[in-house]
UniProtKB/Swiss-Prot annotation:
Sequence similarity: Belongs to the bacterial solute-binding protein 1 family. WtpA subfamily.
One term of GO molecular function: molybdate ion binding
Entries under InterPro entries matching the protein: ABC_trnspt_W-bd_WtpA, ModA/WtpA
Alphabetical UniProt keywords: Signal
Organism whose genome encodes this protein: Methanococcus aeolicus (strain ATCC BAA-1280 / DSM 17508 / OCM 812 / Nankai-3)
Protein name per Swiss-Prot or TrEMBL: Uncharacterized solute-binding protein Maeo_1470
Domain of life: Archaea
Gene Ontology biological process terms from the UniProt entry: molybdate ion transport
Length: 349
């Protein structure tokens, strides 16, 4: 018996209902079918590896208030995350970069029309109890320790990850700060196929498209932060240039570097910009304070939900703070900022 016909209905009514079906019955059937076959939305969030800890927490907060949503998080090098959107048709709904300028230079205007600057970081040198000279290294002698024959240090690829090119910028800035013109040559040039050009007070590091001829007895080089962290912990090598927040999150020991070279402070921006770096794709980056950027790409499948995720981040700055990444409050925004976010943002041109 048709479930939409009340018990006790006349036989003729039953037959007609079975043969032809009523309009109301059809409508109800369609509605129920839709409810059964509609899949919940899964939001795809792509972000720099150094954001893994806070973004795990942001996912929990977001899902608490959007219980019909799934979240797929994907960490990687910022350049790789963006290139997947541009070249591989990746449909990330949220993109967060460890270098805000990558959004403006690589994504705008075709793949994004706005972004926010929302948190900062700085470069430190992390180590473990297994590291050689762990009891001797400090903020004044680190470049001498790294140059010792039985010391191996690591950083991520400058062609793939902002932390990689920032690590090299830090080493180059050290030459200027300590007034020792051989630091970059001793640590980088002698052990890689990198180059450097010095002109009019500006030092430009040159990274070839193909990084090769790495002295693997001296340097541990991988594409992403996750690939360099575990080997450090297990004693594969001794020291790692990494973000302070990541070192804190992984309970690593580290030495802090002078503010003049660690890329962590706005007041030293004029000093930082004395160093530039040209990556393998020919793009030149100027050293500047480490500031994260976030956007919802134009290619996102779920624009509205992506904006809601960004709003969740802005509503809960304590998550970034607890992860060792000081927030910029209010966030600084550029471009066509969504209306839902404007109350949290200082918009600039």
């Amino acid at each position: 018996m048709n479930k939409y016909i009340k018990q006790g209905a006349p036989i003729l009514g039953i037959l007609l209902a079975v043969m032809f079906g009523g309009r109301e019955g059809d409508a109800t059937t369609k509605t129920n079918t839709t409810e059964k076959t509609t899949n919940p939305i899964t939001l795809k969030v792509s972000y720099a590896g150094s954001l893994s800890v806070p973004f795990e927490q942001y996912e929990k907060i977001y899902k608490k208030y959007h219980n019909n949503m799934g979240v797929q998080r994907e960490a990687g090098g910022s350049v790789d995350c963006i290139e997947k959107i541009i070249y591989l048709n990746d449909t990330a709904d949220v993109l967060a970069s460890a270098d805000y300028s990558l959004i403006s230079t690589m994504m705008m205007p075709e793949y994004a029309d706005w972004y926010l600057m929302n948190a900062r970081n700085e470069i430190v040198i992390a180590y473990t109890d297994k590291s050689n000279y762990k009891d001797e290294i400090n903020s004044d002698n680190w470049y001498n320790i790294l140059n010792k024959p039985n010391v191996k240090f690591g950083f991520t690829s400058p062609n793939k990850d902002p932390c990689g090119y920032r690590s090299l910028m830090t080493i180059q800035l050290a030459e200027l700060h300590y007034n020792i013109p051989t630091i970059f040559n001793d640590l980088a040039l002698k052990n890689t196929n990198f180059g450097v050009e010095k002109e009019n007070g500006t030092n430009t590091i040159i990274i070839p498209k193909e990084i090769k001829d790495i002295n693997t007895d001296k340097i541990f080089l991988r594409n992403t932060e996750s690939e360099v962290l575990e080997p450090l912990k297990t004693g594969v090598y001794d020291y790692l240039f990494i973000y302070k927040s990541v070192a804190d999150q992984h309970n690593l020991k580290y030495i802090e570097l002078p503010k003049e070279i660690n890329l962590g402070y706005h007041e030293y921006a004029d000093n930082y910009k004395k160093v530039k770096l040209t990556t393998g794709d020919g793009k030149t980056k100027t050293a500047k304070p480490i500031i994260y950027g976030i956007t919802v790409p134009k290619t996102a499948k779920h624009q509205k939900e992506g904006i809601e995720f960004v709003k969740t981040i802005l509503e809960h700055p304590e998550v970034f703070e607890n992860a060792g990444q000081p927030v910029i409050e209010p966030a600084v925004g550029f471009g066509n900022i969504p209306d839902e976010l404007k109350e949290f943002v200082e918009i600039r041109k």
